[in-house]
Amino acid sequence: MSYDYEDLGLVAGLEIHQQLDTETKLFCNCPTERREPEEAVRSFTRYLHPTKSELGELDEAALEESRVDREFEYLAFDTTCLVEEDDEPPHRLDEEALATAMEIATLLDCSVVDQAQVMRKIVVDGSNTSGFQRSTLLATDGEIETDEGAVRIADMLLEEESAARIEEHDDGVTYGLDRLGIPLVEIGTKPDIRTPTQAREAAERIGMLLRSTGKVKRGLGTIRQDVNVSIEEGARVEMKGVQSLDDIDDLVENEVGRQIELLDIAETLRERDAAVGEPRDVTEVFEDTESGVIAGAERVEAVRLDGFDGLVGREIQPDRRLGTELSDHAKRHGAGGIFHTDELPAYGVSEAEVEALRDAVGADAADAVALVAADTDVAETAIEAVADRAETAIEGVPEETRGANEDGTSRYLRPLPGAARMYPETDVPPVEPDPSDIDPPELLTERVDRYQSDLGLDAGLAEQVAYGRYMPVFETAVDRGVDPTTAAGTLASTLTELRRDDVAVENLTDEHLLSVLELVEAGDLPQEGINPALETLADDPSLTAEAAVEEAGLGGVDRETVREAVVEVIERNADQVEAEGMGAFSGLMGECMGQLRGKADGEVVSELLREEIQKRA
């Protein structure tokens, strides 16, 4: 659906989180490589609790998280140490990470601070063993351009990445320490964004600047976008964990729609003098129920929602309703979700049970009833959370942190964090960053233009190479005299083809690729031999390029040997050549290449085949 965003007063901002590609982590000497859970050498468990800030305040988001009793298990590896486990003080801030972050700050036109103080940001969802994340304000007051106007950069922080969530189970969560401590920059814009398309363009621009350094990690999960959205009369909502730039405009548009619907629901509820009753134990109502979910529960708690009839089931985002919002809050406290009378009778709940439920809580026809079926403790806390969210629905749109879903919608996570979650880190001394020696890199957009004008690549191939992960290999290959088009085609297309054919491309080192390209340039390997040579190297990475060429029988042959092979093919097909002349070319070319593939350049084969056919035509 299209909206008049100016009329609605849309205000949006971004937070971009990007991992840096450094040798070691931010506060220890462990490598930044990722590991598989089965590679863990041991595990340990922790319980986390919120602590007060230096002003004696508790952060609301941390406090809510702590109300959910969960055990956190951590997987340790032979590439992690006691710093990640919070059993050893952090080391000094990593110099490589600091230098890369300052380079990014320069590209964002930010001012680097005179002194950077490491802070502790309270996080009790288990993703940090210490219960806090170390974060450093490094730069402020930048700006980027978009087609719809400038977007100011509020700040850029250098911080440690959280632990990787491996598995969530009934009692808690399992995390991997391999990701914890990887250097990360967090870039926050000011609320200058006014449309969903501008939000996406701003994110793309920041992403391009980050990749221009050549010093950020690539791949799924290495960059995350958070989007802050509000409309006039609505509320600020932070949506976390957007993995793809393609999702940003849909996410913003759907959040605008959600807030519009919630405001309309709130107005209707106030017109109905809506209210929320007290939760009640209604377990007896369902003693003989045929609903499997309810029958298996220890306790059933319900709450009357005065004036809510027909509104709990109202859609506020694609396939998500007000009831889904209530359910999200119940789930945060361990329940599987909720039932509500806008969708009952259903799920094994009979009409008679619905009427008995209404009688038990004193609901009339204008009211709705929500219920939770779970263990006693869970049911009691979950129904309280549902009641609180229903109270908020009467007021309008709540400020909150939400998680981005893959379909462009979002789900409730927790309240918005406040300033009470930050306090100084006393184990790490402040640093005085000096950006005077920073030399800003060539932007990827400029690199694309140069590849076209100086190296003769077409626009599509130039962009593929410039934005691709093998851009540094391409630059080195060209510096070593390799033909740019050959290098670009190999790195942008050939490797993709091999990956689709299930070749273990990840086994190929940069030197493998460069050596194969140099053999082609030297005439020791025809272009048709690139694929089989790389396949051989991927199967056995211990080989050199020269050894792989020899093992695969790909060594180039001289022109006369090619001619002999061509003549042999023609003589085998003499009748066809006599009857069709050059019309036989295509079929004979395929036969020749089948015999010479990987040993002779296709252009040479084609040239000699034409010559020999013409002699006989």
Curated annotation (Swiss-Prot):
Enzyme class: ligase
GO cellular component: cytoplasm
A molecular function GO annotation: glutaminyl-tRNA synthase (glutamine-hydrolyzing) activity
Keyword Phosphoprotein: no
Pfam families: GAD, GatB_N, GatB_Yqey
InterPro entries: Asn/Gln-tRNA_amidoTrfase_suB/E, Asn/Gln-tRNA_Trfase_suB/E_cat, Asn/Gln_amidotransferase, Asn/Gln_tRNA_amidoTrase-B-like, GAD-like_sf, GAD_dom, GatB_C_1, GatB_Yqey_C_2
Catalytic activity: L-glutamyl-tRNA(Gln) + L-glutamine + ATP + H2O = L-glutaminyl-tRNA(Gln) + L-glutamate + ADP + phosphate + H(+)
NCBIfam families given in the database record: gatE_arch, PRK04028.1
Known function: Allows the formation of correctly charged Gln-tRNA(Gln) through the transamidation of misacylated Glu-tRNA(Gln) in organisms which lack glutaminyl-tRNA synthetase. The reaction takes place in the presence of glutamine and ATP through an activated gamma-phospho-Glu-tRNA(Gln). The GatDE system is specific for glutamate and does not act on aspartate.
HAMAP family the record matches: GatE
Self-association and partners: Heterodimer of GatD and GatE.
Protein name: Glutamyl-tRNA(Gln) amidotransferase subunit E
Organism: Natronomonas pharaonis (strain ATCC 35678 / DSM 2160 / CIP 103997 / JCM 8858 / NBRC 14720 / NCIMB 2260 / Gabara)
The gene coding this protein: gatE
